[in-house]
Amino acid sequence: MLLFFEVITMIFVGIDVAKDTHYAAVSDDSGAVLVKPFAFQNNAEGFCLLLKKLSEFDRSKLLIGLESTGIYSENLICFLYESGFRLAVINPIQTATLRKTAIRKTKTDKVDTMLIIKSLMVNSYRLYSQRDADFLKLRTLCRFRQNLKKSKARLKIQLAGYVNLVFPEFGKFFKSGIHIAASYALLKKYSSPKEIAALRTSTLCTLLSKASHGRFGKDTAEALKSLALSSVGVKNPYISIQIAQTIAQIELLEQQIKDLNSAIEEAMESINSVLMTVPGIGAVNAACILGEIGDIKRFSKPCKLLAYAGLDPTVRQSGQFTAKSTRMSTVSYTHLRAHETSAHLV
């Protein structure tokens, strides 16, 4: 009697990532489920449980797949990679497409683990590498910088509102607006028209001249004092406190962003990217784009990179009809869109 044993060449692990509880399942290359979907916590105990489940299999045959889900997946990705597992990070769009083709449009964490495994089987994948780990760290740094910039922009809007209440004429006094060094230096110390009008012309002249490196002098000081005397702003000392403290927050954020820029530029010194050769794109812009895209080599064709960045045109065609004008695709990442816009403006 002859016995035939099926040789398993690949073992797939699908992990559905969430904030507190992850789900994982294991299947062989024929689709047979070796380990049914199970939950494990996003902590040391949970990670040990995952390792215990995976220790039952030959590590050389294991391929782990999980979706790129932002901050919730980063620590698990780093843990698995540093533990020596082969790893593939999947675009969530791929699993979403597979879900649409299913007869039952069920979406649960357990079902998603099997969809991730199926995605590994039917779609091309690329193994996670040290270069990807470097780009992941870069992305974290750049996104933090982007958040600081958003906070600064929000504070600037608030500051303009406060100034418009107490000294509405001040907003148009400087051609460059209120968000300049001379304006900040003045408003931090004297944020009401009454205080500015009471200053000696020489004192105001010295303050403005020093903050503007000589750009504003006596004529500017006299004109500003005259404007302050006739201001129709509200007399509210508490808003003056808000103005001074808001400027302090803006200046702190500006210094933090400057420090982050230095850290990003230092990190880019070890990354050899063709983006650095593009005129007008500096180290920070290049780092932010690379942090979102990752290793450009993972895109086999330029059109795939364009699609990932949301720069591919949508196509409307039916029968012999083809639309003459179409919109750009809206499928892309918000963070990447922001950096694309920034690069276009350079």
What residue ranges belong to the model's regions?
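A detector of single, family-specific signature residues
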Residues: 1-337, 342
